[in-house]
Amino acid sequence: MSHHDAQDFWSDKYRAAGQAYLFGTAPNRFLQSQSALLLPGQRALSIADGEGRNAVWLAERGLDVTATELSPVALDKAATLAAARGVSVDFALADALRWTYPDEAFDLVVGIFIQFAAPDERRALFENMKRTLKPGGCIVLQGYTPKQLDYGTGGPSAVENLYTAALLRDAFGDFELECLQEYESELDEGLAHRGHSALIGMVARKV
């Protein structure tokens, strides 16, 4: 899918939700469960952040947050959410696959359901996430596993875009894996992520 096709695809989805938030306004639960990692003043990057739910929550914790998002429709809603919550986020209209990732700039890199990337693109995206992280910093990643195709409660339909523990262990083998778990849970994240889901969560520290 081209950059413009992807932008139109996601903008149409966010626009169709109307005043509602497609993925809700509450932070992702796996990210929330890692709150012990967060310190005020840390620099955080939230990739393909959508309508701002995760970036805004991080900013509420006192972090200095940059959030990338491909869809201008989603960014407008994200800015509205940040204003309503009284926080500031540096929202960047950018394709996560093409954004210029600064070297060793962030203490925390967050990727929540960023499974739009095909395998070749995913490898490059993961390398950029690793490179932009400061030594000692952490990547927090949440995605769906292939079993999610049995449930159909969210996520991509292409099995090659889904994560397994083996895939992430290989991709982040040069990091310290503080958490890597496949599990099933009920999701209630806005209109798009609802119901029983097959999930994987990872926390990887740059050493």
Report each predicted region and the residues it spans.
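Short "lid" loop at the C-terminus of a central beta-strand within the Rossmann-like core
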Residues: 116, 143-149, 184-185
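Conserved class I S-adenosyl-L-methionine
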Residues: 1-39, 147
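Conserved beta-strand signature within the Rossmann-like core of class I S-adenosyl-L-methionine
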Residues: 136-143
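Class I SAM-dependent methyltransferase SAM/SAH-binding core
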Residues: 43-47, 51-98
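A short, conserved alpha-helix within the catalytic core of class I
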Residues: 116-129
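Acceptor-substrate binding/catalytic loop of class I
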Residues: 150-167, 191-195, 199
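A short acidic, Gly/Pro-enriched loop at the edge of an enzyme's catalytic core
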Residues: 97-108
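Short alpha-helix
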Residues: 160-181
